[in-house]
Amino acid sequence: MSMFCFQCQEAARNKGCTVRGVCGKTGDVANLQDLLVYLLKGISIYAEKAKELGVVDRETGAFITRALFTTITNVNFDNKRFEEIIKEAFEVRDRIKNKFLKAYREKNGEEFDEKLPGMATWYSNDVSDFYAKGEEVGVLSTGDEDVRALRELLTYGLKGIAAYAEHAYILEEEDQEIYSFLQEGLVATTDNTLSADELTALVMKCGEVAVKTMALLDQANTSNYGHPEPTQVNLGVRNRPGILVSGHDLKDLEELLEQTEGKGVDVYTHGEMLPANAYPAFKKYDHFVGNYGNAWWQQKEEFEKFNGPILMTTNCLVPPKDSYRDRVYTTNVVGFSGVKHIRDRKPGEQKDFSPVIEHALKCDPPEELENGMIPVGFAHNAVMSVADKVVEAVKQGKIKRFVVMAGCDGRHRSRDYYTNVARNLPEDAVILTAGCAKYRYNKLNLGDIDGIPRILDAGQCNDSYSLVVIAQKLAEVFGVDDINELPISYDIAWYEQKAVAVLLALLYLGVKGIRLGPSLPAFLSPNVVKVLVDKFDIKPIGEVEEDVKAIMAGE
């Protein structure tokens, strides 16, 4: 079965994956994901119509959010799980459809008889039809490449928002306006009457809602676990069995730490879970050791050497090797065929991590990969607490430039660019980072400026919000109206759809001159790229030395 997917930075030949995803997903899974997104658009059509009649269904919004998250790169590779979610999508669509029809009947005194597009009506109880239909309704079903580019840019931004909204929801923070925009955006991708300008306006609104969603998640994280504090994180290991926690879900980490306390098992973070070491709430656990390994794409070698079980709370999962597959556990929206899955928590209860803990007790301690310490925890609250010191260093010329190098890491050798930029920036430049892009340079010894580390790590990719807050506060302190007048440059690395949401957030806030790499998105047509270049001065990365000179010159 053929497929077409170009949603991530590693799309084959920077055009698209057509046989199997570079990420490892099969054509079957890709087509099921396309069908699921198609059905979410149908659900959204009814949700939007119901909203016009004053009917708002929170459960529908929550389902769309969670389902969109499953389609993000490196989240779920399990076709059986997608079959079940698609069946659930039919049920959700019927429920919101019936609520709408009832409200319409009550208001108008007649039945609704408007013809709706296929995503609002198509149904089959034959699973084999799911695969054929998915192949039919993929991204190439939109013929005009510019319309397709704008629709997919919007869709991928929506996926990123959905991921952040789902994390907030798990921590009991939600916002109906976010759910409503996800529905509005999905419906817009089905509307053939929308002009390119109207779609572009929705893309910018997507950036606005991305800021709102990251702020909501920041509130959820900090209200539950405290504000991150500057913290030195241990990179070594202890001589006890361990559990490695990867992904982004702090609630899972919290419950695992509680359930492992006093059990003789250590807990380590991996990848995007590294920033958890900076939250005050987790520092009380003596068996919370530190961080093991690097960015997601190196996990095959690192998971093999960890020896104990690995808990994947969200992306990024790489198809596991046979040598350690039996030690991988997925939870939440993550899935892989044949890998053990920890079920969602019941209301008022914790997840049951006992299978993971029992497994760990039978395993050898981790093999040490490295040792030493790295600093984390420089989110907006921590940086603003020393704002006077930062401002003084800028005024005295000790800090000439802040360089935002947030985003994602990936496999491409071209990403060495970011390591070399960090190495070549002069000693009066400070790097602001968030997301796993940090692993390209966070272990370099770049020193500090008057006690301010030259790499300030704000946290996970969603903590790019902290970088926005820091920039806005600096603008306030320096009395500038335009954020682009600050001594801040942006050299962003992207990989998946959450990075698209972060990029759109920056564009909405008016940031110009962003360098985006290691390649421009395959899903953008030449005309859409031209619009982004003309309006926002987005540029591809170049040679390291030339880029560093330009960055320091504010270009």
Curated annotation (Swiss-Prot):
Gene Ontology terms: cellular component: cytoplasm
Swiss-Prot/TrEMBL cofactor(s): [4Fe-4S] cluster; hybrid [4Fe-2O-2S] cluster
Assigned EC number: 1.7.99.1
GO BP field: response to hydrogen peroxide
UniProt cross-references to SUPFAM superfamilies, sorted A to Z: Prismane protein-like
Keyword Metal-binding: yes
Signal peptide: none
The protein's enzyme class: oxidoreductase
Residues found modified as Cysteine persulfide: C408
Cofactor annotation remark: Binds 1 [4Fe-4S] cluster. Binds 1 hybrid [4Fe-2O-2S] cluster.
Localization: Cytoplasm
Catalytic activity, reaction form: A + NH4(+) + H2O = hydroxylamine + AH2 + H(+)
Gene Ontology MF term list: 4 iron, 4 sulfur cluster binding; hydroxylamine reductase activity; metal ion binding; peroxidase activity
Residues the entry annotates as binding [4Fe-4S] cluster: C5, C8, C17, C23
Chief location category: cytoplasm
Positions contributing to hybrid [4Fe-2O-2S] cluster binding: H248, E272, C316, C408, C436, C461, E496, K498
Entries under InterPro entries matching the protein: HCP/CODH, Hydroxylam_reduct, Prismane-like_a/b-sand, Prismane-like_sf, Prismane_a-bundle
Gene3D superfamilies cross-referenced by the UniProt entry: 1.20.1270.20, 3.40.50.2030
Keyword annotations: 4Fe-4S, Cytoplasm, Iron, Iron-sulfur, Metal-binding, Oxidoreductase
Metal-binding is among the record's keywords: yes
PANTHER family per the UniProt record, alphabetical: HYDROXYLAMINE REDUCTASE
Sequence similarity: Belongs to the HCP family.
Role according to the record: Catalyzes the reduction of hydroxylamine to form NH(3) and H(2)O.
Protein name per its UniProtKB record: Hydroxylamine reductase
Species, as recorded: Halothermothrix orenii (strain H 168 / OCM 544 / DSM 9562)
Recorded name of the encoding gene: hcp
